[in-house]
Amino acid sequence: MNIIITGASSGVGFEAVIELILSGSHKVIALARSQDKLERLLEIAHGLNPDCQLFALKFDIVHDDYEGLQQFIASHFDNRVDILINNAGVLINKPFAELLESDFVEMLQTNFIGHVRAIQALVPLMPSGSHILNIGSMGGFQGSAKFPGLAAYSASKSALHTLTECLAQEFTEQGVKVNCLALGSAQTEMLEQAFPGYQSPVMAFEMGKYIADFALTGSKFFNGKIIPVAASTP
């Protein structure tokens, strides 16, 4: 499988990459904004599996030119993408009364528009049977518990959830499945920012493994689904 994952340099994205390279049967392109963190990812991955086919590229899904990414894909993947994992995301924890319009713009750009740009650029390279997996949040899941300070973040994730349902229908003829995992808490830097002092019962590597496994197999059973993945609240 040829797999691309965004937001790959930390948290559950980092752990999903590690899970995907262990078998040696997949080619993985890891995208993130931090070159230093990507180099650390490469070092750890090759330490675990010296023969892994992992290619890292410093890339901003919101602001960078996708022509460069497409050239990178052509050189490493021969213009074929089997799985796209849209994991990149940021979080602002701030009371609603203090939120600026720029805060909402930042959340929507990174957590929604960036994924729109990635899908538009890459779906032409995805054959029938491919899988787009969006990483959402329980914060944006309808009917879930909501928390003060996360209005902008939760709204941006809710937009990604709805996009998932829409694109599953639009890509029916092409044969590309689209699903979304609405993640609950996992012990990451982002969780610590949102809920200081809270200890999640789920470790980042456990959630990363779940994401990797679902990316590989979930499209056999689901399409257009927003699946809650939460063992606790948050």
Predicted regions and their residues:
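Conserved glycine-rich Rossmann-like NAD(P)H-binding loop of the short-chain dehydrogenase/reductase
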Residues: 25-41
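Rossmann-fold cofactor-recognition segment
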Residues: 48-64
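C-terminal helical subdomain
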Residues: 173, 180, 196-234
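Substrate-binding pocket helix/loop in short-chain dehydrogenase/reductase
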Residues: 95-96, 103-105
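Conserved NAD(P)H cofactor-binding loop of Rossmann-fold oxidoreductase domains
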Residues: 87-93
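Catalytic loop of short-chain dehydrogenase/reductase
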Residues: 133-159, 164-165, 169-173
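Conserved glycine-rich cofactor-binding loop
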Residues: 9-11
